[in-house]
Design a protein with these regions (language model features):
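N-terminal, positively charged nucleic-acid-binding surface of large information/translation enzymes
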Residues: 2-216
């Protein structure tokens, strides 16, 4: 839709201006192609999501080139490319195998986690449970917003004030769901203080502060 080229044109103007002034400009394009909309469209059309996703990427690429935007296509990325998502999997595994040391205020390898003596005496199952309770990435029950119409989990930002789903307009409900969680609050203060040194518009930084929040 028209909103895409509007934003792309603005960054392309800056990229072209910087190039003409002798800067080495990194101006790639990529596709955030994983997601529930892609899955749902594949279900509705009876087509494998890889087929529909690749077709959409090809269409976007063709349209962007027709607009004459100066992206570096040698650096094109696609989140469904194994060469790309292997690194997101690698990051998740790193989080899973890390615990947060409050004394040093940083993450450490899970193999360095001190195990209390009473836990050791309780046996292997208790030891595993204790270790899992300290991982930065852990599996737990949590309340989520669920849209019965779309059959998907909704982010808080997708739920309107009247309790409806912004995408379909139908009511959402609260459900308990087993899911992966991250201990982001442990890093909240560091993330918040890091915003102060960024040369970003204050409105964007305030938005980030609201997203990060603080551990209470």
């Amino acid at each position: 839709h028209v909103g895409h080229p509007e934003g792309y044109t603005a960054t392309d103007i800056v990229a072209r201006y910087k190039r003409m002034n002798g800067f080495n400009v990194l101006h790639p394009m990529g596709w955030d192609a994983f997601g529930l909309p892609a899955e749902q469209y594949a279900i509705q059309t009876g087509t494998h999501p890889a087929v529909t996703t690749n077709k959409n990427c090809d269409t976007f690429r063709r349209q962007i080139k027709e607009l004459g935007l100066s992206y570096d296509w040698d650096r094109e990325i696609n989140t469904t490319d194994p060469k790309y998502f292997r690194w997101t999997q690698w990051i998740f595994i790193k989080l899973y195998n890390t615990w947060f040391d409050h004394k040093t205020n940083r993450g450490r390898d899970i193999n360095e986690l001190p195990i209390p003596l009473d836990v050791v005496k309780a046996g292997d199952e208790a030891r595993k449970k204790y270790i899992d309770s300290k991982r930065l990435a852990y599996y737990d029950d949590a309340q989520i917003w669920y849209c019965p119409s779309c059959r998907i989990v909704c982010a808080n930002e997708e739920v309107l004030t009247d309790g409806s789903h912004e995408k379909c307009g139908n009511r959402v409900v609260r459900r308990n769901l087993k899911q992966w969680m991250l201990r982001i609050p442990y890093y909240a203060e560091r993330l918040l203080s890091g915003l102060d040194s960024l040369d970003w518009p204050e409105g964007i930084k305030e938005m980030q502060r609201n997203w990060i929040g603080r551990s209470t």
